[in-house]
Regions:
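Generic structural motif recognizing short loop/turn segments at the entrances and edges of beta-strands
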Residues: 1-3, 77
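Structural alpha/beta surface segment adjacent to cysteine/selenocysteine redox centers
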Residues: 11, 17-118, 203, 207-214, ...
């Protein structure tokens, strides 16, 4: 029986792009079925304390540029750290990805064109004709999918993805969720690989030692609501 993994991401995310090919190769090696779940990062950030790039401290913004260059080299991807059409309204692109999933098709080939479209090829993914071209280019029925992407059912699926992400504490892009354990960021792919190779049980985020339990319950009961 195939194992599966939930993949929360957005096409606006450089980290999702940088890790996408490596992640997909990993899923092939481990025979994992991938549940592709595009999400709205502004909504996720608002609910989990994350900040959009322009709200972060300048030092953090500068460090991000260094990290993009490091990981560009590490993963061997083409990436412009200041792409022409970024940031952009990603809703149409993410909704199209949802529509592909809902149609029963695998969105991987589309994503392999769309991600570098933003970060390497200076394409505007907020433009519907660009999306049609990319989808057509990988053999998908682009016009039908574009119409489906505007449907109420796709909108509800997108909202459900967001709800599910929040329920499992997937608070950024990309997040890979294996048996309930969240691996946040493409720089955790090697840790995900280790978990899959070892076959260990999923780590939990609600376990504390007996001493920690005693300290919270008896010494600092005010921390129970923290």
């Amino acid at each position: 029986m195939h194992r599966s993994i939930d993949y929360y991401f957005s096409l606006v995310s450089p980290s999702a792009y940088i890790g996408h090919a490596t992640f997909m190769n990993l899923t092939q090696r481990h025979s994992l079925d991938v549940n592709f779940k595009p999400v709205s990062l502004p909504t996720i950030f608002a609910e989990t304390g994350g900040l959009p790039l322009n709200k972060r401290a300048p030092a953090r913004q500068r460090y991000r540029i260094m990290e993009l260059q490091r990981w560009r080299e590490k993963r061997g991807v083409r990436l412009n750290v200041h792409p022409k059409f970024w940031p952009f309204n990603v809703e149409a692109a993410d909704h199209l990805t949802v529509a592909i999933v809902e149609s029963g098709a695998n969105p991987n080939q589309f994503l392999r064109k769309a991600f570098p479209g933003v970060w390497a090829d200076e394409r505007n993914l907020a433009d519907e004709q660009t999306l049609v071209m990319l989808a057509d280019g990988v053999g998908l029925p682009a016009q039908k999918l574009l119409a489906d992407a505007k449907s109420e059912s796709v909108k509800k699926r997108y909202e459900k993805n967001i709800k599910e992400a929040l329920e499992v504490d997937a608070f950024g892009s990309p997040c890979y969720v294996l048996n309930g354990e969240v691996f946040w960021g493409q720089d955790r792919i090697e840790l995900l690989d280790d978990a899959l190779t070892s076959g260990r049980k999923a780590y939990r985020n609600d376990i504390c030692s007996s001493w920690e339990y005693f300290a919270i319950r008896c010494i600092h009961p005010d921390l129970q609501s923290a």
